[in-house]
């Protein structure tokens, strides 16, 4: 079974799936779905569309240069069947796949390394720009603490609530949420 790659987005095209376009010079273009075929006909550049693998590789979001990627290259030269060779090839394929996955994980971790610091800096800027958000949060925390102190004073018997009462409260919350959503839709 031969699995082709989509000419536009580079995703796999399995037998019996996708569309094949054959140009006058007998060049074959295989597409995984109509979306890719339509974009190809519109002469769009796959490197500019964020959902294609070409974009991800061009933008540095996926590994481009790695020795494990060379093993998946297509080889058209037929080789005489040899049982030992097939067995070794299958074992090597598994090892190469494991190595590739490890390297991809390491590449992703390396790429995401600075995100925490950047997010923290963004949050800091947001708080500096809108200090009222912190005040609102402080008020909420005080209310929660006061409510917690009031609950401690009550008996444990009063704290126990039957399952029926809890389910009724949940239904009321859902109804309130649905009403607020419908109001938002009416406003928009």
UniProtKB/Swiss-Prot annotation:
Gene3D superfamilies: Ribosomal protein L24e. The keyword Calcium does not apply. Residues 140-188 are annotated as: Disordered. GO terms for cellular component: cytoplasm; nucleolus; preribosome. PROSITE patterns: RIBOSOMAL_L24E. It comes from the Eukaryota. Keywords: Cytoplasm, Nucleus, Ribosome biogenesis. It is found in: Cytoplasm; Nucleus. InterPro entries: L24e/L24_sf, Ribosomal_eL24, Ribosomal_eL24-rel_N, Ribosomal_eL24_CS, TRASH_dom. GO terms for molecular function: structural constituent of ribosome. Residues 147-169 have a biased composition (Acidic residues). GO terms for biological process: ribosomal large subunit biogenesis. Associated with nucleolar and cytoplasmic pre-60S particles. At the end of biogenesis it dissociates from cytoplasmic pre-60S particles and is likely to be exchanged for its ribosomal homolog, RPL24. Belongs to the eukaryotic ribosomal protein eL24 family. This is Ribosome biogenesis protein RLP24. The gene is RLP24.
């Amino acid at each position: 079974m031969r699995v082709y790659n989509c000419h536009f987005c580079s995703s796999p095209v399995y037998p019996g799936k996708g569309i094949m376009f054959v140009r006058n010079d007998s060049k074959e273009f295989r597409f995984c779905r109509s979306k890719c075929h339509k974009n190809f006909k519109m002469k769009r550049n796959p490197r500019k569309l964020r959902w294609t693998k070409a974009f991800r590789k061009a933008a540095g979001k996926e590994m481009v240069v790695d020795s494990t990627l060379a093993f998946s290259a297509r080889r058209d030269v037929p080789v005489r069947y040899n049982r030992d060779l097939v067995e070794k090839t299958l074992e090597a394929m598994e090892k190469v796949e494991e190595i590739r996955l490890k390297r991809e994980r390491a590449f992703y971790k390396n790429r995401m390394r600075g995100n925490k610091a950047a997010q923290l800096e963004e949050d800091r800027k947001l708080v500096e720009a809108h200090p009222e958000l912190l005040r609102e949060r402080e008020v909420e925390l005080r209310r929660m603490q006061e409510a917690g102190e009031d609950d401690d004073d009550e008996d444990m018997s009063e704290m126990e609530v039957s399952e029926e009462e809890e389910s009724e409260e949940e239904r009321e919350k859902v109804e309130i949420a649905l009403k607020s959503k419908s109001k938002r839709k009416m406003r928009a």
